[in-house]
Amino acid sequence: MADDRKVALDAALKKIEKNFGKGSIMKLGEKADQKISTIPSGSLALDVALGVGGYPRGRIIEVYGPESSGKTTVSLHAIAEVQRNGGTAAFIDAEHALDPQYAEKLGVNIDELLLSQPDTGEQGLEIADALVSSGAIDIVVIDSVAALVPRAEIDGEMGASHVGLQARLMSQALRKLSGSINKTKTIAIFINQIREKVGVMFGNPETTPGGRALKFYATVRLEVRRAEQLKQGTDIVGNRTKIKVVKNKVAPPFKVAEVDIMYGQGISQEGELLDMAVEKDLISKSGAWYGYKEERIGQGRENAKQYMADHPEMMAEVSKLVRDAYGIGDGSTITEEAEGQEELPLDE
């Protein structure tokens, strides 16, 4: 009886592979890529909070938070890391607000960055689908979901009611995109804004626009919020920012990364490296003084950060020690992993 069932199962598997192609069904243990492939986020603290050393490839990421909290900065750092590792990046600028000079300061190669500023939400999502399906893109950032305005709303009159249009658009798009994103190992980052539900007496009134589909399809959801202002004398030079992993399908969620986002510079690599090294006792802290290998490197956090910025050899050494202490790799090269990607047929 058991042999009959095995023969029947083998016949069914062969039929499925014949109809839908090799690899359409397999035993979980046979799948070659069991280890989660990642791309560094551009922030060591965020790599640790994500639990797998970066953004998982072939997955959807949602980055949301209040205005000017650092959502686009976090996403641009991811693009810079992809390009640094030999990958190709695209930016769908639905808000029409990308600053090329700022992106360049964060390490983005703007000459190689693919940019689209769509007129409608449908156009933006179709462009994203075409790029992902090509199999030649490693990361695509959509900024933002709230700005993906349906064509019917743009063509209609100001003030006209269009209930649920954007939610339906996002639901349909994600149903179509999720499969090709996974097959081509593309990272899709959706930046989102915050809205408040009217009449909520208890609980959190905050929600994100675009319906519930993105919440379900996202493997990782990051909440970005400003914690405090950073001052140098009387001048405000940046913000202390908390990035909370509110959803994570590849590692335990609810971890928090604290980073310094400096105006005109982006995430301070020195600041997060200093904090993480102190936490692992790789850099000593006595009162206001910081020390490394019996040598004092600065009084006060800002001075210690400046010392590290002025001594790149020491920073590279500490970075390696911190990565080893937290079990984070240097990030794999994208070009090698991309060889296994397949190009998907575009819809006619």
Swiss-Prot record:
Keyword DNA damage: yes
Family matches, as Pfam families: RecA (PF00154), RecA_C (PF21096)
Keywords, alphabetical: ATP-binding, Cytoplasm, DNA damage, DNA recombination, DNA repair, DNA-binding, Nucleotide-binding, SOS response
UniProt-annotated location(s): Cytoplasm
GO biological process: DNA recombination; DNA repair; SOS response
Major localization class: cytoplasm
Record NCBIfam families: tigrfam_recA
Protein name listed in UniProt: Protein RecA
Source organism phylogeny: Bacteria, Bacillati, Bacillota, Bacilli, Lactobacillales
